[in-house]
Amino acid sequence: MAQGHGDAKGTTAHTEAGGGHKAPFPPFQQETFASQLVSLAIAFVALYLIVSKIALPRVGGVIEERQKTIDGDLAAAQKLKGEADDALKAYEAELADARARAQAIGAETREKLNAQAEAERKTLEQRLAAKLADAEKTIATTRTAAMGNVRNIASDAASAIVQQLAGVTPDSKAVDSAVDASLKG
């Protein structure tokens, strides 16, 4: 059935090496050293060619493309900054122009309102002067009429007083001249 591990037929144990020492590590064997250097040189040349002809141009292309993109972005940013600066200058110029126009409109409006107010003031002064002149005429007329009535009343009162005090009826011309003299003076 099952056989043991130790007694396999046709196998021999290789536990000992002939000659008494071990073989050196193959890369350090002096007989193969020259061929190893040639193989190393060929491998480095092949690696150098692969890197310089395939990998480095790709990396260089990527770096160059990135630099172009960065330069393009910087140029676009400078252009946009210039446009923004121009727009800001135009805005400030428009704002200054609008302020100047607003001040001019304000000054013009003030002048118009002042002229209109002055014209209305003069018209009002003329109307008030005319009303004052009419009122003075009315007062003078009323005063003259009142003084005429006062003169008549004073003459009648003086005649009545003289008549009551003296018992004599005075002359109307003498009473009128006495009343006129007292009113004048």
UniProtKB/Swiss-Prot annotation:
Belongs to the ATPase B chain family. It holds the Pfam family ATP-synt_B. GO terms for cellular component: plasma membrane; proton-transporting ATP synthase complex. PANTHER family: ATP SYNTHASE SUBUNIT B, ATP SYNTHASE SUBUNIT B', CHLOROPLASTIC. F(1)F(0) ATP synthase produces ATP from ADP in the presence of a proton or sodium gradient. F-type ATPases consist of two structural domains, F(1) containing the extramembraneous catalytic core and F(0) containing the membrane proton channel, linked together by a central stalk and a peripheral stalk. During catalysis, ATP synthesis in the catalytic domain of F(1) is coupled via a rotary mechanism of the central stalk subunits to proton translocation. The keyword Ubl conjugation does not apply. The keyword Transmembrane helix applies. The chain crosses the membrane at residues 37-57. Keywords: ATP synthesis, Cell inner membrane, Cell membrane, CF(0), Hydrogen ion transport, Ion transport, Membrane, Transmembrane, Transmembrane helix, Transport. GO terms for molecular function: proton-transporting ATP synthase activity, rotational mechanism; proton-transporting ATPase activity, rotational mechanism. It is a single-pass membrane protein. F-type ATPases have 2 components, F(1) - the catalytic core - and F(0) - the membrane proton channel. F(1) has five subunits: alpha(3), beta(3), gamma(1), delta(1), epsilon(1). F(0) has three main subunits: a(1), b(2) and c(10-14). The alpha and beta chains form an alternating ring which encloses part of the gamma chain. F(1) is attached to F(0) by a central stalk formed by the gamma and epsilon chains, while a peripheral stalk is formed by the delta and b chains. It is found in: Cell inner membrane. This is ATP synthase subunit b 2. The lineage of its organism: Bacteria, Pseudomonadati, Pseudomonadota, Alphaproteobacteria, Hyphomicrobiales. Residues 1-26 are annotated as: Disordered.
